[in-house]
Amino acid sequence: MIIGITTTYEEDHGYERANVEYLERIAQAGGTPVLLPPAPGGDEAAIAAAREVATRIDGLVLSGGGDIDPALYEEARLPETVNVVHTRDIYEMALARYAHELDLPVLGICRGMQVMNVALGGTLYQDMNACGLTAVDHQQQPPYDATEQRADVASGSLLARLLCGRPETGMAPGCQ
């Protein structure tokens, strides 16, 4: 089973990178991890490459990284929107759409979940703090190992009902 993993561009150093843990976990589960850096050559090349790649993989991991260009969901960029890489955005949006069309399993990690949302027509809050929605800093710093984040659940909401009135539960051993 071939599982594609998108990469993150390190502009300061001029290379693509991936979290080695993603590769290790896929291999431990019996899969073959394959890194998927964006194709050079502009938007059309990136979209064509995404189409080709999607037909050759059995699953997709859309990894974390910088912000998505707000122009892709028809908004002006805020000063807080950082680390936008246009080629990556176009490539991953196309990958997400083709994976959806082909009914491939997709795991979106942080930015990856946002890519799936925008690729299928959704929008985003560019910056939760700038929009006045939270005082929590959602931008994780190295070593990028935070495994959880607190969320308040509105009483009586669908989520509260799904959680059976227990919005605060403990993490399983080994998941902390």
Predicted regions: what is each one?
Residues 110:
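Conserved G/P- and acidic residue-centered "switch" motifs that form tight phosphate/ATP-binding loops
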Residues 175-176:
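Histidine-centered catalytic micro-motifs
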Residues 113:
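The feature captures the ABC ATPase H-loop/switch
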Residues 1-107, 117-125, 129-166, 172:
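N-terminal beta1-alpha1 cap of cysteine-dependent amidohydrolase-like domains
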